[in-house]
C-alpha cells in the first residue's frame, strides 16, 4: 500500500480553487501562465551584531526556528567607519523558503503571527515592487509561536518578501488576496 506524501493546506487550496479562479479572472490560455508562489525570503538585519557576535548567532537561531530550516548568517562586504563596521563582520541573517516549507510559513504568517501583532489594521496594498513581488516588515519577531517570549532576550524586526511568478502587481495582488492576505482597504 503506497503512502501519500504530505501536501500543505495552502497548496491544496491553490490547486483546487485559486488556480481556476485566477484563470477565469485574467483569461489565461495556458496553465503555466497562472501566477503561483515562487519563494519567500526572510531577512533579519542585526545592527547590534557589530559589537556582539553572539547576537547574530542568536538571531540566526530564532530565524531558523521560525522558518523551519537553517538560517544563513550574512556578513558585511565593505568597511564603513561611520557605523564602526569592518569587512566580514556578521550583520544579519536570511532564509529562502520554497515548496512545502514556503506554504507552511505563509499559512502560519497569515493565520497565527499577523493576528498577534498589536494594533494590526491590515497589510499595506502598495508594497508591491512592480514585478509581482510583495514585501512586508515585521517589527517584532516574537509574534511567531515558535519563539518563546520569556526566553527571547531581544526582539528584532524582520523583512518578509513573497516572490511570485506574476507579471504585474494586479495579478500578484489577486493571487495573494486569494491566499487570504489581509490587505488594508
Swiss-Prot record:
One of its GO terms (molecular function) is structural constituent of ribosome. One of its GO terms (cellular component) is ribosome. Keywords: Ribonucleoprotein, Ribosomal protein, RNA-binding, rRNA-binding, tRNA-binding. InterPro entries: Ribosomal_uL5, Ribosomal_uL5_bac-type, Ribosomal_uL5_C, Ribosomal_uL5_CS, Ribosomal_uL5_dom_sf, Ribosomal_uL5_N. PROSITE patterns: RIBOSOMAL_L5. The keyword Flavoprotein does not apply. GO terms for biological process: translation. It comes from the Bacteria. Part of the 50S ribosomal subunit; part of the 5S rRNA/L5/L18/L25 subcomplex. Contacts the 5S rRNA and the P site tRNA. Forms a bridge to the 30S subunit in the 70S ribosome. This is one of the proteins that bind and probably mediate the attachment of the 5S RNA into the large ribosomal subunit, where it forms part of the central protuberance. In the 70S ribosome it contacts protein S13 of the 30S subunit (bridge B1b), connecting the 2 subunits; this bridge is implicated in subunit movement. Contacts the P site tRNA; the 5S rRNA and some of its associated proteins might help stabilize positioning of ribosome-bound tRNAs. Belongs to the universal ribosomal protein uL5 family. This is Large ribosomal subunit protein uL5. It comes from Nitrobacter hamburgensis (strain DSM 10229 / NCIMB 13809 / X14).
Amino acid at each position: 500500500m503506497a503512502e501519500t506524501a504530505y501536501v500543505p493546506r495552502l497548496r491544496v487550496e491553490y490547486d483546487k480553487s485559486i488556480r481556476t479562479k485566477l484563470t477565469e479572472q485574467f483569461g489565461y490560455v495556458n496553465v503555466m501562465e497562472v501566477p503561483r508562489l515562487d519563494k519567500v525570503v526572510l531577512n533579519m538585519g542585526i545592527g547590534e551584531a557589530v559589537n556582539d557576535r553572539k547576537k547574530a548567532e542568536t538571531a540566526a537561531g530564532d530565524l531558523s526556528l521560525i522558518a523551519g530550516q537553517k538560517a544563513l548568517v550574512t556578513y558585511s562586504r565593505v568597511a564603513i567607519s561611520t557605523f564602526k563596521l569592518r569587512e566580514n563582520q556578521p550583520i544579519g541573517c536570511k532564509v529562502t523558503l520554497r515548496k512545502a516549507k514556503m506554504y507552511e510559513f505563509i499559512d502560519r504568517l497569515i493565520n497565527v503571527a499577523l493576528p498577534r501583532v498589536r494594533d494590526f489594521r491590515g497589510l499595506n496594498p502598495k508594497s508591491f515592487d512592480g514585478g509581482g513581488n510583495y514585501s512586508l516588515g515585521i517589527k517584532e519577531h516574537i509574534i511567531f509561536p515558535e519563539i518563546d517570549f520569556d526566553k527571547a532576550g531581544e526582539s528584532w524586526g524582520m523583512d518578509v518578501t513573497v516572490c511570485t511568478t506574476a507579471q504585474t502587481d494586479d495579478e500578484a495582488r489577486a493571487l495573494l488576496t486569494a491566499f487570504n492576505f489581509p490587505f488594508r482597504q
